[in-house]
Amino acid sequence: MSIEVVEVRPHERHFGVYALKFEDGSERLATRNLTPGKRVYGERLVKWGGAEYREWNPYRSKLAAAIANGIKFVPIQEGTHILYLGAASGTTPSHMSDIVGERGLIYSVEFSPRVFREFMEKLVDQGRRNVVPILGDARFPYQYAHYVKGVDVAYIDVAQPAQAKILADNADYFLKPGGYVMLVIKAMSIDVTAPATETFKQEINTLKERGFEILETVHLEPYDTAHAMVVARKR
Ligand SMILES: C[S@@+](CC[C@H](N)C(=O)[O-])C[C@H]1O[C@@H](n2cnc3c(N)ncnc32)[C@H](O)[C@@H]1O
């Protein structure tokens, strides 16, 4: 039998993020479900105060891991337009879709046709109208330049080498002046022989060289080994 939720309250720092409190005193992150009754990855749904919330699992979503680890600033709120590179089957994009609401947009780029089909089934076919699915390769932003309008945030989680470069190339095309980038660094996919901190430094240097001011870096352990999240702003 699952334990009961005894309180749902807004997160003290992040817009559109909630804390679910359980009867045993434990707490979990959640977002308010934009498509009530529908799940994306088997997450728990909680009805509270006339709304429905989706539990946000930090072991499944690196943005949730960064929030659970105390990231201070997430540049996402109601109405934010986001370019999401490496959308996979939509776990993190679905929570962003909850947060930005009907006035926001998540341009979601994924290059694997099989995974993209899952994304379509789980998000688009389920009625998330603020998601724009793009089957494309993030290394070649010109391929989808005609679909994407200026964005407030560019987010990357492609688990491939040269992520900072790919992110900066996309920012050159699509990021509005003063916009933000969020970079998930997976040390192993960049250089398996280098220690994680070395790899993190290299990727951060690439962002600095491309004109970004680094605002924050958060490690994602214990949720993800050798991963970090970097938030930066275009100077
Ligand atoms: C770690 S998963 C992303 C998980 C997702 N961000 C989430 O939190 O829900 C990485 C995804 O990036 C995709 N990917 C890798 N290289 C890519 C590229 N160059 N362009 C687009 N997608 C890419 C992979 O197919 C995979 O689905």
From Swiss-Prot:
**Listed GO MF terms:** histone H2AQ104 methyltransferase activity; RNA binding; rRNA methyltransferase activity
Concerning Gene3D superfamilies, the annotation shows: Phosphorylase Kinase, domain 1, Vaccinia Virus protein VP39
Superkingdom field: Archaea
Under Pfam families, the record lists: Fibrillarin
Which keywords, in A-to-Z order, does the entry hold?
Methyltransferase, RNA-binding, rRNA processing, Transferase, tRNA processing
Q: Which SUPFAM superfamilies match?
A: S-adenosyl-L-methionine-dependent methyltransferases
Kindly indicate whether the keyword Magnesium belongs to this entry: no
> Which EC class is this protein assigned?
transferase
What biological processes does GO assign it? box C/D sno(s)RNA 3'-end processing; tRNA processing
Q: Provide the binding site for S-adenosyl-L-methionine.
A: 91-92, 110-111, 137-138, 157-160
EC annotation from Swiss-Prot or TrEMBL: 2.1.1.-
Its biological purpose: Involved in pre-rRNA and tRNA processing. Utilizes the methyl donor S-adenosyl-L-methionine to catalyze the site-specific 2'-hydroxyl methylation of ribose moieties in rRNA and tRNA. Site specificity is provided by a guide RNA that base pairs with the substrate. Methylation occurs at a characteristic distance from the sequence involved in base pairing with the guide RNA.
Subunit text: Interacts with nop5. Component of box C/D small ribonucleoprotein (sRNP) particles that contain rpl7ae, FlpA and nop5, plus a guide RNA.
Report the family membership.
Belongs to the methyltransferase superfamily. Fibrillarin family.
| PANTHER family assigned | FIBRILLARIN, RRNA 2-O-METHYLTRANSFERASE FIBRILLARIN
What is the protein name stated in its UniProt record? Fibrillarin-like rRNA/tRNA 2'-O-methyltransferase
Q: Which organism is it from?
A: Pyrobaculum neutrophilum (strain DSM 2338 / JCM 9278 / NBRC 100436 / V24Sta) (Thermoproteus neutrophilus)
What is the phylogenetic placement of the source species in the record?
Archaea, Thermoproteota, Thermoprotei, Thermoproteales, Thermoproteaceae
